[in-house]
Curated annotation (Swiss-Prot):
A GO CC term assigned to this protein in UniProt: cell projection
InterPro entries: CMI2A-C-like_dom
Location of the protein in the cell: Cytoplasm, Cytoskeleton, Cilium axoneme
Family: Belongs to the CIMIP2 family.
Predominant location category: cytoplasm
Name of one Pfam family that matches: CMI2B-like
Coiled coil: none
Protein name as annotated: CIMIP2 protein GA14893
Protein task: Probable microtubule inner protein (MIP) part of the dynein-decorated doublet microtubules (DMTs) in cilium axoneme.
Entry keyword set: Cell projection, Cytoplasm, Cytoskeleton
Disulfide-bonded cysteines: none
Length: 324
């Protein structure tokens, strides 16, 4: 009867909030007896070390921080002005190197391991820096001591530092004068980016431009400035190289290609044809016209501006003729 009331060891005390392997899949027994069977079952995959240690456990059984990490931290305090000193207590809100890569450890152990890894990397950098300074000293010829075996294996150049300035026959050669640099014209609202030079920084279309951008349909995955710049470069190359005869008809083709086509190619509102229905830009007077298609309404849209150039009142009360 006494054996039935006493839970055998080992077992977990009821109220333990930690993890117990396969405990949620077993039912029908008390927490103590159930965890006892789970802890001694050889068929269950347990962690390599128990989280709950016996009371009589020795203090030397802790694995973290390791002896190597403590040695690195002590040596660091002797060599440099150490900001991080062991132990770093929990609650420290500052930055600790390599802290994010330490998992499954207490705060003191994780902080010690992170600082030890950082110090090991910095020691490697300091060693490489000393090797480079030592090699420069050997190549400069200022070292008066005999070179050792490891110094002979260092890669050496055929010259000595610092380099000595040489003045020879080239002193009498006249320097070539470069042509004066022509300053680029400043960008303005009347400048079209379509036919600017490919290396021009202003050859792109700003965000919010609602009209057609040539050769930009097949491009994606780039920012607006990069995408429109490459699209305009492809467009200008195509127009200059593939259709040079069509652009430059009536001109002397023996001369270099023109830098910009005629201004008539950039007309938006034509006198004899209307805008395409998908045009999302502004059309003068389109708001006050109705009863016809979009293409018929937008023919010669600038005439609306000429009619209302001297108008002082609203178009609704001016009783003007909109039959054009």
């Amino acid at each position: 009867m006494m054996n039935d009331t006493i839970t055998p060891e080992p077992h977990l005390v009821p109220g333990y909030t930690g993890h117990c392997t396969e405990n949620r899949d077993r039912v029908g027994k008390t927490y103590g007896k159930q965890t006892h069977k789970l802890l001694i079952d050889p068929c269950i995959y347990h962690a390599p070390e128990l989280i709950v240690l016996p009371i009589h456990a020795k203090q030397g059984l802790k694995d973290y921080p390791t002896e190597h990490e403590l040695k690195v931290l002590r040596r660091r305090e002797d060599l440099v002005d150490a900001v991080y000193r062991h132990p770093i207590l929990p609650g420290y809100a500052g930055f600790v190197p390599n802290m994010a890569s330490q998992t499954g450890k207490r705060y003191v152990a994780a902080a010690s391991a992170g600082v030890a890894q950082h110090e090991t990397l910095m020691e490697l950098y300091r060693c490489e820096n000393r090797t480079l300074r030592h090699r420069d000293l050997l190549e400069s010829g200022k070292g008066l001591f005999e070179r050792k075996l490891n110094e002979r294996l260092l890669p050496q150049a055929r010259y000595r530092s610092p380099l000595i300035p040489v003045t020879g026959r080239s002193k009498g050669v006249k320097d070539e004068e470069c042509p004066p640099r022509v300053d680029k014209l400043r960008y303005s609202k009347f400048t079209s980016p379509h036919f600017l030079e490919d290396d021009d920084d202003d050859k792109f279309i700003i965000n919010g431009y609602a009209a057609h951008i040539p050769m930009a349909v097949t491009r994606f995955g780039e920012s607006n400035q990069v995408l429109t710049h490459r699209a305009l470069c492809s467009f200008s190359d195509y127009m200059y190289k593939r259709k040079r005869d069509a652009w430059c008809c009536g001109q002397d083709l023996t001369r270099p290609a023109v830098t910009c086509p005629p201004v008539g190619h950039f007309v938006i509102y034509h006198d004899d044809i209307g805008m395409v229905p998908s045009y999302a830009g502004h059309v003068p007077g389109e708001l006050y016209k109705f009863g016809r298609t979009y293409g018929k309404t937008t023919i010669n849209a600038k005439r609306w501006l000429d009619i209302h150039r001297g108008l002082t009142g609203l178009p609704e009360v001016s009783n003007l003729d909109y039959t054009y």
